[in-house]
Amino acid sequence: MLANVVSRKASGLRQTPARATVAVKSVSGRRTTAAEPQTAAPVAAEDVFAYTKNLPGVTAPFEGVFDPAGFLATASIKDVRRWRESEITHGRVAMLAALGFVVGEQLQDFPLFFNWDGRVSGPAIYHFQQIGQGFWEPLLIAIGVAESYRVAVGWATPTGTGFNSLKDDYEPGDLGFDPLGLKPTDPEELKVMQTKELNNGRLAMIAIAAFVAQELVEQTEIFEHLALRFEKEAILELDDIERDLGLPVTPLPDNLKSL
């Protein structure tokens, strides 16, 4: 009988989870103990990699997870979701910026720019200071409204554990804005379309950086630079033909020599 009681007591002790205690002193000086709060176990690295590998945007030639800087080694799924939201947003802004560069340089006299005292001219990197204030004010308000809507739809209340994190039921990038009804209902088709958007956004981020660098170095507009490159290549090809025929070579204009 006594053995059975001892056995049950020992079994109960084994099933009770251990809790760490911290010895503290009360105001009266007596020594007491308080239980330490239990912390959640960190998400395993394998879970983060598996989650990332199944996201839209994994594409050739990088069929696996492309993470040369090793960000995922110390990241959580919450971090990955926030980074994906940032990538989608920056890609969309870059696509608009790349389009705005080339269109803005072709519509330099368009009255929407509120530049009544003179014309907007030159590379797009110098248009900011030439365009009237009446254009930037409504644009700033529109950006503020759009960003406020994005925060309201996707971001958690910044208190407690919700600081700097997305809502649990929010799909990064999905703001519910689909006026043309192009969003596929099939999950696989949706993933393909999301991958296309990500790839176009990634290309646009590289393109807008190249646009800015090219205009800073050569001080020419995008299409003007492209036309000059074609002109130079045409002259060089013509020179090769003239050499083969024993004809005088067409000289390369000075403005094309530096291209």
Curated annotation (Swiss-Prot):
InterPro entries associated with the record: Chloro_AB-bd_pln, Chloroa_b-bind
Disruption phenotype: Impaired in non-photochemical quenching (NPQ) under high light conditions.
GO MF entry, a single one: metal ion binding
Residues bound to chlorophyll a 4: N200
One of the GO biological process terms: response to high light intensity
Residues that bind chlorophyll a 5: K196, Q214
Name used for this protein in its record: Light-harvesting complex stress-related protein 3.2, chloroplastic
Organism: Chlamydomonas reinhardtii
